[in-house]
Swiss-Prot record:
<protein>
    <recommendedName>
        <fullName>UPF0301 protein Ppha_2142</fullName>
    </recommendedName>
</protein>
<dbReference type="Pfam" id="PF02622">
    <property type="entry name" value="DUF179"/>
</dbReference>
<dbReference type="InterPro" id="IPR003774">
    <property type="entry name" value="AlgH-like"/>
</dbReference>
<comment type="similarity">
    <text>Belongs to the UPF0301 (AlgH) family.</text>
</comment>
<dbReference type="GO" id="GO:0005829">
    <property type="term" value="C:cytosol"/>
</dbReference>
């Protein structure tokens, strides 16, 4: 496996390697929203929580979609990805057609009036963050891979299969990695 840190940028996927056993990131798929000389910020895509947005986020009482654990940093903050940057001021495009953040009051209004559908948004509690040099060191240790992101992956509900499918899509030796058991020592 090669160190793919140089390929990392906003809009890419970050895939936990099969060697990543730390529970917060084991077999996770994250979308990178910010990556620069100060560090990196991403959201875990395949860690849905048991409760719904309407149960945890004020102003979004009509949103029956599940809330997602974005990462272990600042878990008392709410973040969102969406596909309607044309309607929400302050949105940052992280890849074509996918936006991070923006005005939460506008978002609430657009959802409550039916202009936007809940399927166009993914809500997260917290985020995954790395300071300068930290993520690069983890890549050097073989903890992460990268992959191309897409709207289909970001808004997918196939949580259980997301990591395996995404790693497998890289081809070659990654197909073997994707099929490896979670705890090979128990075989």
């Amino acid at each position: 496996m090669v160190n793919e840190f140089d390929k990392l940028k906003a809009g890419k996927l970050l895939l936990a390697s099969a060697n990543m056993l730390e529970s917060s990131f084991k077999r996770t798929v994250l979308v990178v929203c910010e990556h620069n000389e100060r560090g990196s910020l991403a959201f875990i895509l395949n860690r849905p929580m048991e409760f719904k947005v309407c149960e945890a986020v004020s102003g979004f009482e009509e949103v029956e979609e599940r809330l997602h654990m974005g990462g272990p940093v600042e878990v008392d903050t709410v973040h969102f990805l969406h596909s309607r940057g044309d309607l929400i001021d302050g949105s940052l495009e992280i890849l074509p057609g996918i936006f991070w953040g923006g005005d939460k009051n506008e978002l609430s209004y657009l959802l409550n009036t039916g202009v936007m559908m809940p399927s166009e948004i993914r809500f997260f509690l917290g985020y995954a963050g790395w300071s300068a040099g930290q993520l690069e060191a983890e890549f050097e240790e073989g903890a992460w891979y990268t992959a191309e992101a897409s709207k289909d992956i970001i808004f997918s509900d196939a949580y259980e299969r997301m990591w395996g499918r995404t790693v497998r899509s890289k081809g070659g030796e990654y197909q073997i990695v994707a099929n490896s058991p979670e705890l090979p020592g128990l075989n």
